[in-house]
C-alpha cells in the first residue's frame, strides 16, 4: 500500500504540473465527444434523495467537486466517492490500483472513474478515514446497535408520553370510588367466583329441542336453568345503576329506558370477564359455569358465540374491578337509546365517566399498545350483543312456553327496538 500511496505529494502541486504532456485531458475530451454522455454524467446529476441541513447549498465533494450529499468517513463527499472509498477498503482493492500517468491525475466528476489510484489517493489526502469503514461483521453489529437504540428511544418516548398523560383529579377519584363500590356490592361472588361456581351438568343442553324459525333450536331444560338466575342478575344491574349519583338525578322515564337498553350488555360484560380458558366456560351471575354450546342451545344462539368471543379477547386486557365498573357506567349512560328525554344531560354524564375512565387508564399504565382505544371498541361489541339479543328474544318468546319467562325478564326485554 505504501508504494501505491507514494505519489500523494504531487496533489499539492499546481494543476498545470499534474498533466506533464496534456494527453490525459485530451483523452477525457475525446471520450465525451464520442458518446455525448459518459457513465459519470449520470452520477453527476444532483441526487434526488435527502440532503442534510448542515450542508451549504450545492456544497461540492472534496474529492471530485460533484454535489456533496453528506459527511462520509470524516469528509464531505458525494455518494459516488463515498461508495468508491467504502468498496476499496472493504474489498482491499487499493493494492491492485495503478496509474498510467505517474499518479498525478486531476480528479473531478468527469475524470474520477478513469484512474482509481489517483481517486483513492485524493480520498486519503482530503482526510477520508479508512478506520471508519466497517467490515461485514462490524456493519451488522452497528445496524443491530442502531436498531437497539431505536427501540430504546421508542420505549423512553412511550414512558415519557405516559407520564405526561393526565391522571384522575380528586373529584374524579371520588367518582371512580363510588362507581367501583357500586359494582363490587352488586357483583355476585366478587373475586371468589371461581371457588364458588357450579358447572352446569354436561347432559343439560343436549336434550330434545324445540325448533326455532331461524333454524336454531332451544333446549328447554337449559333455558329453564338460565331463567332461574336471570331475575337476580337483572336486579343486580338495576341496583348498580341506582348507586350512581348522576343516574339518580335523571327522570324515572329516562332511567327505565337506559336500564332496558344496557341490561343485557352489562350482564354480558360481567359474564365475559369471568371467562375461564382452562375449562372454556363463562360463569353466569357469579354461580353457574356454562360451555359455549350449552349457552347457545339454552336460547341465546349466535349471541352465545359473541359473548364467548368477547370473554376470550377481554382476558388479554386484565381488567380490574374499577375498569369493569367504569365500562358498565359508560354503557348505562348511552344517550342514543330510543325515547330518551334528557339526551344532552345523559351525554354529559357519559362524557364525565369517559374522561374519568381514560384518566384511570393512564394511571394504570397498561403494557398493551393503544389500550384505551382498543378497550373502547369493546363498548361497540357489547352494544352489538345487546342488539342481537333483542332480536333473539323475539324468537324465544314465540317458541318457548310463556310460563318459563320470569316477569322481570319480560318487563326488561319486551318492547325493545330491534
From Swiss-Prot:
It is found in: Nucleus. Belongs to the nuclear hormone receptor family. NR1 subfamily. Keywords: DNA-binding, Metal-binding, Nucleus, Receptor, Transcription, Transcription regulation, Zinc, Zinc-finger. The keyword Nucleus applies. A zinc finger (NR C4-type) spans 61-81, 99-123. One of its GO terms (biological process) is cell differentiation. The gene is thra-b. Coiled coil: none annotated. One of its GO terms (cellular component) is RNA polymerase II transcription regulator complex. It holds the Pfam family Hormone_recep. SUPFAM superfamilies: Glucocorticoid receptor-like (DNA-binding domain) (SSF57716), Nuclear receptor ligand-binding domain (SSF48508). High affinity receptor for triiodothyronine (T3). Residues 171-415 form the NR LBD domain. Binds to thyroid hormone receptor element (TRE) weakly as homodimers and monomers, but binds TRE with much higher affinity as heterodimers with retinoid X receptors. Can bind DNA as a heterodimer with either rxra or rxrg. GO terms for molecular function: nuclear receptor activity; nuclear retinoid X receptor binding; protein heterodimerization activity; protein homodimerization activity; RNA polymerase II cis-regulatory region sequence-specific DNA binding; sequence-specific DNA binding; thyroid hormone binding; zinc ion binding. It comes from Xenopus laevis (African clawed frog). Composed of three domains: a modulating N-terminal domain, a DNA-binding domain and a C-terminal ligand-binding domain. This is Thyroid hormone receptor alpha-B. Residues 1-40 are annotated as: Disordered.
Amino acid at each position: 500500500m505504501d508504494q501505491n500511496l507514494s505519489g500523494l505529494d504531487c496533489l499539492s502541486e499546481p494543476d498545470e504540473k499534474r498533466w506533464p504532456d496534456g494527453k490525459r485531458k485530451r483523452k477525457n475530451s475525446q471520450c465525451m465527444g464520442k458518446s455525448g454522455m459518459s457513465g459519470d454524467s449520470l452520477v453527476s446529476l444532483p441526487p434526488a434523495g435527502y440532503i442534510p441541513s448542515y450542508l451549504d447549498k450545492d456544497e461540492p465533494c472534496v474529492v471530485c467537486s460533484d454535489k456533496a450529499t453528506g459527511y462520509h468517513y470524516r469528509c464531505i463527499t458525494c455518494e459516488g466517492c463515498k461508495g468508491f472509498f467504502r468498496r476499496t477498503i472493504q474489498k482491499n482493492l487499493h493494492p491492485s490500483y495503478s496509474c498510467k500517468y505517474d499518479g498525478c491525475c486531476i480528479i473531478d466528476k468527469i475524470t474520477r472513474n478513469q484512474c482509481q489510484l489517483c481517486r483513492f489517493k485524493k480520498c486519503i489526502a482530503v482526510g477520508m478515514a479508512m478506520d471508519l469503514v466497517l467490515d461485514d461483521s462490524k456493519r451488522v453489529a452497528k445496524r443491530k446497535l442502531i436498531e437497539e437504540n431505536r427501540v430504546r428511544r421508542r420505549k423512553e418516548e412511550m414512558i415519557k408520553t405516559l407520564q405526561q398523560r393526565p391522571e384522575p383529579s380528586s373529584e374524579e377519584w371520588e367518582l371512580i370510588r363510588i362507581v367501583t363500590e357500586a359494582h363490587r356490592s352488586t357483583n355476585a361472588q366478587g373475586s371468589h367466583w371461581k371457588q364458588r361456581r357450579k358447572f352446569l351438568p354436561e347432559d343439560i343442553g343436549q336434550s330434545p329441542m324445540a325448533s326455532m324459525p331461524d333454524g336454531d333450536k332451544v333446549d328447554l331444560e337449559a333455558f329453564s336453568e338460565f331463567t332461574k338466575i336471570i331475575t337476580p342478575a337483572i336486579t343486580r344491574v338495576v341496583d348498580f345503576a341506582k348507586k350512581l349519583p348522576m343516574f339518580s338525578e335523571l327522570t324515572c322515564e329516562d332511567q327505565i329506558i337506559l336500564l332496558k337498553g344496557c341490561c343485557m350488555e352489562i350482564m354480558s360484560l360481567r359474564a365475559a370477564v369471568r371467562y375461564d380458558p382452562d375449562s372454556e366456560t363463562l360463569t353466569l351471575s357469579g354461580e353457574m359455569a356454562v360451555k359455549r354450546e350449552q349457552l347457545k342451545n339454552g336460547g341465546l344462539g349466535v349471541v352465545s358465540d359473541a359473548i364467548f368471543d368477547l370473554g376470550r379477547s377481554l382476558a388479554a386486557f386484565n381488567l380490574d374491578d374499577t375498569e369493569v365498573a367504569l365500562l358498565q357506567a359508560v354503557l348505562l349512560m348511552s344517550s342514543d337509546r330510543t325515547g330518551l328525554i334528557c339526551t344532552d344531560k345523559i351525554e354529559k354524564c357519559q362524557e364525565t365517566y369517559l374522561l374519568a375512565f381514560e384518566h384511570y387508564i393512564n394511571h394504570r399504565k397498561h403494557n398493551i399498545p393503544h389500550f384505551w382505544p382498543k378497550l373502547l371498541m369493546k363498548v361497540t361489541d357489547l352494544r352489538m350483543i345487546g342488539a342481537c339479543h333483542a332480536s333473539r328474544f323475539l324468537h324465544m318468546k314465540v317458541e318457548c312456553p310463556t310460563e318459563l319467562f320470569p316477569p322481570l325478564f319480560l318487563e326488561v326485554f319486551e318492547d325493545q327496538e330491534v
